[in-house]
């Protein structure tokens, strides 16, 4: 990868221990030409902010599947700003317990400052394409992911 590849920081926030989704998204982003810093599961907001600053991230992608993303993400944008990070922010997963109306959940996260909000049903390619759009990245390679090859 070249030094000009867009850089993303990726992780599962708070006490959420789900890591399979971010691992698959990591692969899809790398195949699409991104430099990825995967923080893994159970990542604190301060770790996202520090990593984004340290790696001069173009985007910060936050995953949460256990339904408590609103509580876990509260204050994330303040911490990013305090660290001098001006990056696109994306959140996705099962963001709210008993989530039935995704549009309401999406609006809540947009009001928190997220540039893109995705449900757990969103495919990895759609997320990669949205990040490319947000960062105005030219097509570099297909965004399909082949596992086990």
UniProtKB/Swiss-Prot annotation:
Q: Do the record's keywords include Metal-binding?
A: yes
Q: Name the enzyme group at the top EC level.
A: isomerase
- GO biological process terms, semicolon-separated: anaerobic glutamate catabolic process; glutamate catabolic process via L-citramalate
* CDD domains membership: Glm_B12_BD
UniProt key word Metal-binding? yes
GO MF, any single term: metal ion binding
Entry similarity comment: Belongs to the methylaspartate mutase GlmS subunit family.
This protein's name: Glutamate mutase sigma subunit
Q: What is the organism field in this record?
A: Halobacterium salinarum (strain ATCC 700922 / JCM 11081 / NRC-1) (Halobacterium halobium)
Lineage per the UniProt record:
Archaea, Methanobacteriati, Methanobacteriota, Stenosarchaea group, Halobacteria
